């Protein structure tokens, strides 16, 4: 028989779309678990890539200096997926910050922390796999480039706001620019070095001091590599010349570690670098505040003076009201 659809005057009815079967609670949980396991496998591979050679580690540390604070797993993911990113938030976080993500933008996979309540009513923290967007994917004026500071300004900043006591000393061992002494919680700094060498030495020792939990068991040697890398991140963050750094020995030291241990190393570097950066930033802010001249008098005082000096008005006689 002939095709009956040719006899139809109107448009043919579309074939019904088959709906995806809804997953049970157990199936959904299993699917999400598989997604997490796949992501962690990728994170392990990215971790190993960082320690492949000195150049790879340098590239990751450069990204750490460039990017806003993140958990180490996200830094590894973003370094691979969004190497130009500088500041990442979730869709809702950007909304809370007063910015909106442009339509059509695709987010980057990330582990996003969340608080939740267990079945027994106790509070707990966890994470879920979600998306974050870089500031370049949002509407609005893009952030200004960070100002560039001279090395001597950075030295002044760390002296101004150091969380650890700094002391200039000629008793520092030969060949050592600065040294953290755990017994009296002091960083001893050699005098009369150039500003860049001084800053790098202090940044390295401030990073080392951040690992000291003051239990009497601190070992400076145990954190030499982490402190070295953290000083690099801080120097890179503030635009100093970092060409003298070499990371081949660090990679050799970490190459035999398990991925979790390698990430712990990178996390230690990151946290120490953030500590040094906060110290420098606060010091620079204090320097800028102290350099800003105070106005001769405030607007409120001006207004008060004008009100005081203004001649008093004579009260007009009340006018008779019309009856």
What are these regions (language model features)?
Residues 2-323:
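N-terminal accessory/interface modules of nucleic-acid-binding and processing proteins
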């Amino acid at each position: 028989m002939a095709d009956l659809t040719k006899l139809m005057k109107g448009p043919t009815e579309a074939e019904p779309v088959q709906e995806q079967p809804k997953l049970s609670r157990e199936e959904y949980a299993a699917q999400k678990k598989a997604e997490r396991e796949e992501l962690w496998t990728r994170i392990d591979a990215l971790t190993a890539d960082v320690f492949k050679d000195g150049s790879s580690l340098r590239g990751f540390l450069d990204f750490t200096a460039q990017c806003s604070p993140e958990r180490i797993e996200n830094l590894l993911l973003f370094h691979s997926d969004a190497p130009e990113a500088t500041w990442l938030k979730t869709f809702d976080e950007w909304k809370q910050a007063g910015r909106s993500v442009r339509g059509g933008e695709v987010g980057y996979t990330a582990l996003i922390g969340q608080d939740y309540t267990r079945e027994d009513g106790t509070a707990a923290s966890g994470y879920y796999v979600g998306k974050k967007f870089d500031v370049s994917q949002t509407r609005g004026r893009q952030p200004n480039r960070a100002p560039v500071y001279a090395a001597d300004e950075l030295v002044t900043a760390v002296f101004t706001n150091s969380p650890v006591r700094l002391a200039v000393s000629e008793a520092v061992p030969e060949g050592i620019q600065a040294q953290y002494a755990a017994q009296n919680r002091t960083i001893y700094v050699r005098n009369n070095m150039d500003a860049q060498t001084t800053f790098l030495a202090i940044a390295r020792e401030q990073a080392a001091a951040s690992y000291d939990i003051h239990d009497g068991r601190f070992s400076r040697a145990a954190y030499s590599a982490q402190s070295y890398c953290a000083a690099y991140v801080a120097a890179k963050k503030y635009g100093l010349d970092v060409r003298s750094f070499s990371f081949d020995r660090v990679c050799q030291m970490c190459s035999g570690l398990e991925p979790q241990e390698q990430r712990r190393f990178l996390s230690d570097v990151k946290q120490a670098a953030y500590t040094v950066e906060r110290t420098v930033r606060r010091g620079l802010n204090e320097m800028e505040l102290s350099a800003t001249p105070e106005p001769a008098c405030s607007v409120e005082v001006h207004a008060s003076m004008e009100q005081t000096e203004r001649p008093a008005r004579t009260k007009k006689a009340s006018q008779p009201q019309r009856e």
